[in-house]
Amino acid sequence: MEKYLHLLSRGDKIGLTLIRLSIAIVFMWIGLLKFVPYEADSITPFVANSPLMSFFYEHPEDYKQYLTHEGEYKPEARAWQTANNTYGFSNGLGVVEVIIALLVLANPVNRWLGLLGGLMAFTTPLVTLSFLITTPEAWVPALGDAHHGFPYLSGAGRLVLKDTLMLAGAVMIMADSAREILKQRSNESSSTLKTEY
């Protein structure tokens, strides 16, 4: 048993690598999906209700009547989403998310890029977690069941809550990048001192 505990105790390096890869995979995959209408449609309630983002939409107040389920095609809803700038905003967000993934993956080559990716991966969940406050669809609606509203998260709310893990993981990869930058600076300083003497 002790052998396994020692083995597990040395898992922090591999764990950090897995956190970095996981963050990159999530941002890359979801970022690429932002170019597909069903994913763009699915973020409409979050963006339309957000005081930080609703200005990107032409008519955020009208979104409810144009919501669709994943896999469902309604031409009038698609036309409204197009006119609303839903797809333009989603495409821009997709570009940002793919850039975050690439920056996070760039860490072994350039720690500063990795640090920037970690910072961006940290700030993204700060915005998305605010949706728990601003988006009514984050909570189970009052449709007759006794369990609705706070603390009963809907599927959308549960999805948003998982961003707390992204937030924590981003702190870890930022700390790792910063530690490596400081170590590199320290090594450069000591090698400069040695060459001067």
UniProtKB/Swiss-Prot annotation:
Knockout mutant characteristics: Mutants are more sensitive to HOCl treatment than wild-type cells.
Location in or out of the cell: Cell inner membrane
GO biological process, one term: response to hypochlorite
Disulfide cysteine pairs (residue numbers): none
Periplasmic side of membrane: 1-15, 107-112
A single GO cellular-component term on record: plasma membrane
Residues passing through the membrane, by range: 16-36, 86-106, 113-133
Membrane topology (Cytoplasmic): 37-85, 134-197
Its job: Probably involved in reactive chlorine species (RCS) stress resistance.
Protein name per its UniProtKB record: Inner membrane protein RclC
Organism listed in the record: Escherichia coli (strain K12)
Gene: rclC
